[in-house]
Amino acid sequence: MDEEEVEVVESPSEVLQPEVTVVVTGEPPEAAEEDLDYEEEEETSPEVIETLSLLDVLRVSAVMEDVIDQLSILGYIIPVQYERRQSLTQKASHEGASMITTTPKKSTSLLTKEKSMMAENKQRGQDFTFKKPTKQTMMTLETLKKIQNDRQYFSDVIANAMMEMQDSGSFTSLLKALGKERDSKMNFHDVITREEKGRKQIKTLQKQLLDVKRERQMQVQNGNEYIAHLRDQLQEMKAKTNLENLYMKRNAELQISQTQKKCNRAEELLLEEIEKLRMKTEEENRVHTEIEMFLKKQQQKLEEKLEFWMEKFDKDTEAKQNELNALKAAKASDLVHLQDLAKMIREYEQVIIEDRIEKEKTRKKLEQDDLELRSIVKLQAWWRGSVVRKEIGNFKMPKKDKDDSKDSKGKEKEKRRKK
């Protein structure tokens, strides 16, 4: 069922690419999530929407009706009580009839096709509910309620957008609903990032406190070492200054003689350079005129190529924009599919945990029953022995045995006395 919904969402983007022109400016949701570390977020620019033509409105409304039908089928597929299923089927039939009456501009052929498709989809949904696998019947009532609420909310948003599109040719209600969902998600991410920042800041402050203590100790030690080092440097500097003074005097004399020789040589080279430059300027003037003529011809050719490439650029940008819109729609549908799979996995994990808990309870109960049975057997054996020993009830020992036992007891007493 999820794959069918993805195909339905992707189909209108391919049909409406060349005709629907919608411009939405502002920061996308991914960029907003990446900028959560900043304290202030940039304000998004307002959305600009152009009204759609009548043909586009009919196409988009047909697609939205198909989506609403798919959502109603999803409601029939979800395992609920039989009474609720009947009420949902009646509600879906009323919604389908109302939507058909609100679109009088459609042709009769489209209406008959949609009615037949709705009847087939309802029949498929009913058959699927009676042939559900056992895994779906294990879902809890809370998850079913959440799925039903999400499905109802999504169908209401699409229905409102379809009514608005049929009335005014725009879909601002759909954009407002998306904005609300985006704001709630952004607030949740803000709370998480603030908490993480607070924890990181506490850790950094603790580390900084330890670093400051270590730095202070190192600074005191380095200061003492630096004072001793400066004393040594002072003595070395005194000796170096005396040597440098002698060296600077000799070096100044040598530099003066060398600069005089260099100046004479440079003067000769400059005169030769002036003559060469004069020859080059004459040649460059001649080359400049030739290059100017050549560049004018090339300019004309480049202007022609520029016009050609500008037209090609406009066409390519339009094609790439259409591809980008298609990719965005595919990305949104894939994200919805992944979210559904994640929900299903969480539900299966909950079922497995409950099964393990139930098995553990049964094992403990069997052990308790076995222990009670053993204790009962021991108690019965003890009772029977005590009944026989104490002659309770019909159990009595023979008299000879009693006399013998008395004689034996008397003999034992006499032996003890003798000892």
From Swiss-Prot:
CDD domains the record matches: IQCG
Main location: cytoplasm
Region spans: Disordered: 25-45, 394-419
Location of the protein in the cell: Cytoplasm; Cell projection, Cilium, Flagellum; Cell projection, Cilium; Cytoplasm, Cytoskeleton
Domain IQ: 372-401
Highest rank taxon of the organism: Eukaryota
Disruption phenotype annotation: No obvious phenotype, except complete male sterility. Female fertility is not altered.
Family label: Belongs to the DRC9 family.
Known role: Component of the nexin-dynein regulatory complex (N-DRC), a key regulator of ciliary/flagellar motility which maintains the alignment and integrity of the distal axoneme and regulates microtubule sliding in motile axonemes. Binds calmodulin when cellular Ca(2+) levels are low and thereby contributes to the regulation of calcium and calmodulin-dependent protein kinase IV (CAMK4) activity; contributes to the regulation of CAMK4 signaling cascades. Required for normal axoneme assembly in sperm flagella, normal sperm tail formation and for male fertility.
Name of the protein: Dynein regulatory complex protein 9
Origin species: Mus musculus (Mouse)
Organism taxonomic ancestry: Eukaryota, Metazoa, Chordata, Craniata, Vertebrata
Name of the gene this protein is made from: Iqcg
